[in-house]
Structure formats: C-alpha cells, structure tokens
C-alpha cells in the first residue's frame, strides 16, 4: 500500500491461472511438461494467496457440440466438456474460494469488466498451453491494460511442445510482456 495525500491506496497483483485442467495435464491433451509444472504452480498460488493477491482461474469450457465448432473442426479431440472430470481444474492447485472463469475460446474477452474497476497494478500469468491460451490472454490483457506490468512465469507454463512453448515466450517478449523463469 502507498499513501496518496491522506488516503491509503492498495496496490494489487492479479495472478491469472490459465486452463490448468485435467484434460490439459493428464487427460486428452495432457503433456509431461504440464504435469512437471504442477509443483511450481502450487507454490506460486500458495504464495499469491499468502500475499493477498487476486487469484483467478480460467477454464477452457466446451459443450457437447464441440465437434461442430470451428475449434473442434481444427482440433478434433474432445476436451474440457463442461461438467466432466477433464474440465475440472487440477485438484492439487485448485482453490474453490477463488474466482473461476469459464471461457469458450482461447482468450477470455471480458477482462476489462472483471479487472477494470480494481486497483490492479501488476498481472502475472501462468498455466497452459503457453502457445495457445496463455499467449492469447496475455496479448488481450496487454492491449486492454497497456500501463499495467504483465509478467508470464515460464517455469509455471507448459506448451503443446517445448518448441512452441519457447516460440510463444519469445513472441510475448516482443510485445513487452515480461517473461521470467525462462
């Protein structure tokens, strides 16, 4: 917190945990890299809660009609169907008392409404897949909040492959998103 005149202004960090769901970790689209980041994610989330950060979980969310969607035609692997075990956030990192956002697309399109009225001074992004949903949300957030520092912790992210993970980190750095842990 900082003093401005006689008023105290609270500075807040938002930790956004992107799509760390069973289907992306051990399920239909899981990878060994996604499994490997779970201890780092748990530590990061625990530290954020202890620091009083705003913790927000996103969930990739599809319906039974997934195969008929544009994404389903390009990636014909049913995953994260709402209500299934694969759709759930991985138990060891989930915090049911934190905000959970369901999003039907790679990027959440209502960040301005969710974060705009808060005294957020820093945003940190972690999760999966670095090269799809993490980068999509990082770029949306950067466009909406160009004066807020946005960081991606590479040690708490996993991509579809190590190569596309690294490419996404490089692309985000090019857009003035700070990458740590790489």
Each predicted region: which residue ranges?
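Active-site acidic carboxylates
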Residues: 8-100, 121, 147, 151, ...
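Active-site beta-loop-alpha junctions enriched in small/polar residues
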Residues: 60, 106, 155-157
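Catalytic cysteine-centered active loop of the rhodanese-like fold, especially the PTP/DSP P-loop
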Residues: 63, 101, 118-143
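Active-site catalytic loop in hydrolytic enzyme cores
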Residues: 101-111
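Short amphipathic alpha-helix with an adjacent loop that forms part of the alpha/beta core around
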Residues: 111-119
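Short beta-strands and strand-loop turn motifs
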Residues: 126, 151-155
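Short gly/pro/ser/thr-enriched loop/turn and capping motifs at secondary-structure boundaries
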Residues: 132, 157-160
């Amino acid at each position: 917190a900082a003093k401005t005149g006689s008023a105290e202004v609270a500075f807040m960090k938002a930790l956004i945990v992107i799509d760390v769901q069973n289907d992306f970790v051990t399920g239909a689209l899981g990878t060994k890299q996604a499994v490997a980041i779970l201890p780092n994610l748990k530590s990061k989330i625990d530290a954020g809660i202890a620091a009083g950060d705003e913790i927000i979980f996103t969930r990739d969310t599809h319906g039974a009609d997934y195969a008929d969607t544009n994404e389903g035609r390009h990636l014909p692997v049913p995953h994260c169907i709402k209500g299934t075990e694969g759709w759930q956030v991985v138990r060891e990192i989930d915090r049911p008392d934190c905000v959970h956002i369901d999003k039907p697309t790679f990027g959440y399109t209502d960040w301005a409404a969710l974060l705009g009225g808060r005294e957020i001074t820093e945003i940190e992004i972690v999760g999966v897949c670095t090269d799809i949903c993490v980068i999509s949300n990082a770029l949306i957030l950067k466009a909406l909040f160009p004066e807020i520092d946005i960081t991606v912790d590479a040690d708490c992210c996993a991509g579809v492959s190590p190569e596309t993970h690294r490419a996404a980190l490089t692309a985000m750095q090019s857009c003035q998103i700070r990458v740590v842990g790489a």
